[in-house]
A protein has these predicted regions:
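Kelch-like beta-propeller repeat domains
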Residues: 1-200
Length: 200
């Protein structure tokens, strides 16, 4: 994901033999990778969302949900255990910390985005039984807690999510039950509700 630090990118990866805590950052300007401090809790199928350096909580990367077990190469791998854990990376301090509160819904393969005011929105994903979720949660760093918002119209996992120019949140495609979808939805942040958008 873009961290807006010299147009760098960060990623978390599996070493092919199991879970790893390694976090690498790619410096676009130099064309080089380098390591930063590792994630506190190794897991796969997590989502990342970053805040802009100039924002209220600038220079943070959220590592959201994920799974502790199963086959990270398979969307429906057996033995997977979803988690509600959320960790936050401080870019300036090169340090990972827990948010202090887990999400109310453990999930993997979810969508996660941050808005200009530094707040985190998490939606969808799947639980430990590979059931797709509609649930949406909101994290406000000022109080350090999650709160539930209106659920998506349809549950989905492993989908694209982004913030539109007007601040609304859009989700695109993903997996619904046992099939993939091209459907899209938009969350009206001010109105607090979802609506269907044209399919991709």
């Amino acid at each position: 994901i873009a961290m807006d630090r010299k147009k760098n990118r960060s990623e978390m990866k599996s070493n092919g033999k199991g879970l790893t805590q390694v976090v690498d950052v790619y410096d676009v300007g130099k064309g080089e990778w380098y390591n930063v401090n590792p994630l506190r809790t190794p897991r796969h199928s997590l989502s990342l969302a970053a805040t802009a350096l100039g924002g209220r909580n600038g220079g943070q990367v959220f590592a959201v949900g994920g799974s502790f077990g199963g086959n990270q190469q398979s969307v429906s791998g057996s033995g997977r255990r979803a988690t509600g854990l959320v960790e936050v990376y401080d870019v300036k301090q090169d340090r990972w910390e827990s948010t202090g509160h887990d999400m109310s819904t453990p999930r993997m393969g979810c969508g996660a985005v941050t808005t200009e005011d530094g707040c985190l929105y998490v939606m969808g994903g799947s639980n430990s039984l590979s059931k797709t979720l509609r649930a949406m949660e909101f994290y406000d760093g000022r109080i350090g807690r999650f709160s539930n918002l209106a659920p998506m119209i349809k549950g989905r996992s492993y989908f694209g999510a982004g913030v539109l120019p007007n601040g609304d949140v859009m989700v695109v495609g993903g997996k619904q039950s046992q099939s993939w979808t091209t459907s899209c939805e938009i969350f009206d942040v001010k109105g607090g509700r979802w609506r269907t958008a044209a399919s991709c």
